[in-house]
A protein has these predicted regions:
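Arg/Lys-rich, low-complexity, intrinsically disordered basic segments
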Residues: 1-110
């Protein structure tokens, strides 16, 4: 479960979720509809849509670790660029669906 990943990294769930909600708000989503996913495979749920694969880092996690000095400065942004380059190439109609898991991950997790 994602909460276990956060515990291992010593990142309070509230810290992660509040950051995710702020990123959701900045991207034009209603932060009240964002919560931790109850599905073990995913990190977050937005209005019934699970997204963000558990077990992997994301911009929020890498930024927190960067702030703590556990990864070098610029690492979160470098990982963000890699994620965006690969995931914007995914085929399908996800670009036209703001609630697609890929769109949500790109805008909230990354």
């Amino acid at each position: 479960m994602f909460s276990n990943q956060l515990k291992e990294l010593k990142i309070p769930i509230k810290t992660y979720l509040n950051t995710a909600k702020q990123r959701a708000k900045n991207a034009g989503y209603d932060p009240k509809l964002l919560s931790l996913s109850k599905d073990k495979e995913y990190k977050l749920n937005y209005d019934g849509v699970n997204f963000g694969r558990s077990g992997y880092g994301d911009f929020i996690i890498w930024s927190i670790l960067e702030d703590r000095g556990l990864v070098e400065k610029g690492y979160a942004e470098m990982k963000q660029n890699i994620f965006h380059k690969s995931h914007t190439k995914i085929k399908g109609d996800w670009k036209n669906n703001p609630k697609s898991p890929n769109n949500l991950a790109l805008k909230i997790n990354w």
